[in-house]
Amino acid sequence: MLRCRPEPLMPRATRVAVAVSLPLSHAVIPTQLPSHPGHRPSGRPRRCPKAPCLPSPVGLSSTQPAKRVTMGWPRPGQALVAVKALLVLSVLQVPAQAVVRAMLEDISSSVDFADLPALFGVPLAPEGIRGYLMEVKPANACHPVEAPRLGNRSLGAIALIRRYDCTFDLKVLNAQRAGFEAAIVHNVHSDDLVSMTHVSEDLRGQIAIPSVFVGEAASQDLRVILGCDKSAHVLLLPDDPPCRDLDCHPVLTVSWALGRTLALVVSTLFVLNRLWLWAQACCSHRRLVKTSTCQKAQVRTFTRRNDLCAICLDEYEEGDQLKILPCSHTYHCKCIDPWFSQAPRRSCPVCKQSVAGTEDSFDSTTDSFSDEDPSLPGHRPPIWAIQARLRSRRLELLGRASPHCHCSTTSLEAEDTTVSPAPPEAPGQ
């Protein structure tokens, strides 16, 4: 009896489609099919496949060992591997247009038979070639074969030819001359697929029908289907044409969707990062400006001990030119300048600290506070400017102290040496 077994995996090229419609009561095929060594015992009859034994999507294979048909509970490891394989195939699977459909007891089923198209003759049309499969006589088609007997059938005939004994181009040409619309050449004692090539250019130019090559197991399965119903027909389809629609490639569709999502997320994160850096830079700049402003606007405590000149005892007024010595004592320029010009030692009148090293700088620059607002926060004129302004008033103060005396240079120098740290007093006191 016929057993349902998976067909061994083979390279996919074109495919053969078979459609069969069988009644419920089918007996053993009366004719004995030729047996092959190593496949099954000689003389063992074959039966038509019943409904519970429908061909699998992989294909029928009458040459597989019987032990592979044994049904049982799969092992946990095998079940896990099968689940993973189904998941991978569900993602990588591309819709196939070449199928084999076997109709048994109102149950539809399809089987794919792997084949390779010939390198000569016309290629298969995109819609394929449909016809009734018939074995030629002689089986190798090395000689002229009998014409197909179609009767009133609407479809043409497709020849099933055995390999060897002559060239492929001669076999196909003999089938064409007999009236077949296509040819299927099957292997012998092997399921390997070979590419059929021509030998004679003359024969190649005469071939006008397509042809394909299949393995021996596929040919035996086709014979079983033909023996079950004489009205069974086959469909030869070319390789699946490249689908230009993105929906035909699930992997590309998923990759495209994930890529767009990833690009959107990355661009959003990039924009947010740039905005965050910009906000941080603005805050840092504001803090820096505020800090620098506070540093420039230093607060100075006003003390009453620095609001008058120690020489003339007059209070400082706005617009007065002041001179601050390195010892931080402040004088009017008109008061301290005569002191420095007459004294043998250039020193502070109060603390006697020498200022000879800075006298050149006092003479070099004189500035005025009239253009500046001393009430501004942090306003502090340079020391050298204040010191330079105190020089011009010395002679005037000395002249005011002794208006009736003619002050010579010698007397002024002698007077400078007697000045105490306290402010000088008038001669009449």
Swiss-Prot record:
Signal peptide: 1-27
Membrane topology note: Single-pass type I membrane protein
Biological process, per Gene Ontology: protein ubiquitination
Subcellular location: Endoplasmic reticulum membrane
Enzyme nomenclature, EC number: 2.3.2.27
Glycosylation sites: 152
Catalytic activity: S-ubiquitinyl-[E2 ubiquitin-conjugating enzyme]-L-cysteine + [acceptor protein]-L-lysine = [E2 ubiquitin-conjugating enzyme]-L-cysteine + N(6)-ubiquitinyl-[acceptor protein]-L-lysine
Cytoplasmic compartment segments: 272-429
Membrane-spanning parts: 251-271
Topology feature Lumenal, residues: 28-250
Annotated GO MF terms: ubiquitin protein ligase activity; zinc ion binding
Complex and partners: Interacts with CANX.
Protein name: E3 ubiquitin-protein ligase ZNRF4
